[in-house]
Swiss-Prot record:
<dbReference type="GO" id="GO:0008380">
    <property type="term" value="P:RNA splicing"/>
</dbReference>
<dbReference type="InterPro" id="IPR008999">
    <property type="entry name" value="Actin-crosslinking"/>
</dbReference>
<feature type="short sequence motif" description="Nuclear localization signal">
    <location>
        <begin position="22"/>
        <end position="32"/>
    </location>
</feature>
<dbReference type="GO" id="GO:0005730">
    <property type="term" value="C:nucleolus"/>
</dbReference>
<keyword id="KW-0963">Cytoplasm</keyword>
<feature type="region of interest" description="Disordered">
    <location>
        <begin position="16"/>
        <end position="35"/>
    </location>
</feature>
<dbReference type="GO" id="GO:0030018">
    <property type="term" value="C:Z disc"/>
</dbReference>
<dbReference type="GO" id="GO:0006397">
    <property type="term" value="P:mRNA processing"/>
</dbReference>
<keyword id="KW-0517">Myogenesis</keyword>
<keyword id="KW-0747">Spliceosome</keyword>
<keyword id="KW-0507">mRNA processing</keyword>
<keyword id="KW-0694">RNA-binding</keyword>
<dbReference type="GO" id="GO:0007517">
    <property type="term" value="P:muscle organ development"/>
</dbReference>
<keyword id="KW-0698">rRNA processing</keyword>
<dbReference type="GO" id="GO:0005681">
    <property type="term" value="C:spliceosomal complex"/>
</dbReference>
<comment type="similarity">
    <text>Belongs to the FRG1 family.</text>
</comment>
<keyword id="KW-0009">Actin-binding</keyword>
Amino acid sequence: MAEYSYVKSTKLVLKGTKAKSKKKKSKDKKRKREEDEETQLDIVGIWWTVSNFGEISGTIAIEMDKGAYIHALDNGLFTLGAPHREVDEGPSPPEQFTAVKLSDSRIALKSGYGKYLGINSDGLVVGRSDAIGPREQWEPVFQDGKMALLASNSCFIRCNEAGDIEAKNKTAGEEEMIKIRSCAERETKKKDDIPEEDKGSVKQCEINYVKKFQSFQDHKLKISKEDSKILKKARKDGFLHETLLDRRAKLKADRYCK
């Protein structure tokens, strides 16, 4: 086992070359994976498909068929709008609603006419209420990458043969599948807590801090000539900033050093 470890740690020319190639491939795969994630996002223009309850806020649209959205009529009823054929063509103003969160699982929806969406006694979706009551509460249901919208009568919405939007089925089939699209600014990646100066190699890190704190009286960077291995150990032990400050102090390259 000891001999095997020794052989594995020995840097041969060919092995070293492969190792670098493997590292490069690993970075390329990571970059490609991130690009694929962006590509796989279901986006039409500025309208992207939400994948969880937390993403539902502000102006949204409800897509029931490819490019076809729930469309508000001026009589308080709703129908399925004409499909938008253009690749980047999002929902029109009558197809846009304001989502209001009521709890951890329920929302209210307000049309462009200023009325809240609810259901009547016949199970039809209507938008005639000025306030949010029990009938104006909706529950988005996410399962296996699909989504449906549950009304207050415990039925899922769909578009019937007459073109009306109704909620009459207790179970969700293909006809009840929807997409909620949002035009809110999407948070693509969480920002890390690492300062920009601390990123990169220890040598680059030292240069970053010298640039940040040096007084630049002679317009030249003063970088310590001491071994950078000290910095590597300091970073590992959690004393990088203190070590960098000491190195700058020796060169009097920090305007805050006495």
